[in-house]
């Protein structure tokens, strides 16, 4: 892991603190689809109030790079998916964010890379939903 990059997908309540924690020891690329969020974070502003400006400025630009560009993740060998799992009006989990994040990671995944799901999902989602997406999309690229 010494020369490896860690990719954190989703920079919300879970992903951002995780990215900064890893950035204290490793090179981290934080990815989010929300350009406004990335712009704010690069200015040292975390509107979720999970981190202070000092905490952000300590790692951003040195060991933590923030981006909305998927190809920037291609240097990573470890990916940690931290996207939300909202609940529908019928109280069922909406796996759309997890599926979209899985599809994105699959486009930059290389043989030997590791993917970890930190999102709250029911048992079996990784094996039944995410792994088949990785296999299908990985074989296409």
Label the predicted regions:
Residues 87-141:
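Rossmann-like NAD(P)(H) cofactor-binding subdomain of soluble oxidoreductases
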Residues 2-5, 27, 33-78, 84-92, ...:
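Conserved N-terminal Rossmann-fold NAD(P) cofactor-binding segment
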Residues 11:
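Glycine-rich Rossmann-fold phosphate-binding loop(s) that bind the pyrophosphate
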Residues 22:
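Aromatic pocket-lining residues of Rossmann-like dinucleotide-binding sites
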Residues 15-16:
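N-terminal Rossmann-fold NAD(P) dinucleotide-binding loop
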């Amino acid at each position: 892991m010494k020369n490896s990059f860690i990719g954190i997908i989703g920079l919300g309540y879970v992903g951002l603190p995780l990215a900064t924690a890893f950035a204290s020891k490793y090179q981290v690329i934080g990815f989010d689809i929300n350009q406004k969020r990335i712009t704010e974070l690069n200015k040292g502003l975390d509107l979720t109030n999970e981190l202070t400006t000092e905490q952000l400025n300590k790692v951003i630009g040195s060991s933590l790079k923030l981006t909305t560009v998927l190809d920037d993740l291609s240097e990573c060998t470890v990916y940690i998916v931290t996207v939300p799992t909202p609940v529908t009006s019928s109280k069922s989990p909406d796996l759309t964010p997890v599926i979209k994040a899985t599809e994105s990671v699959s486009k930059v995944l290389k043989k030997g890379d590791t993917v970890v799901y930190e999102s709250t999902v029911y048992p079996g989602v990784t094996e039944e939903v995410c792994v088949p997406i990785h296999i299908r999309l990985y074989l296409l690229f």
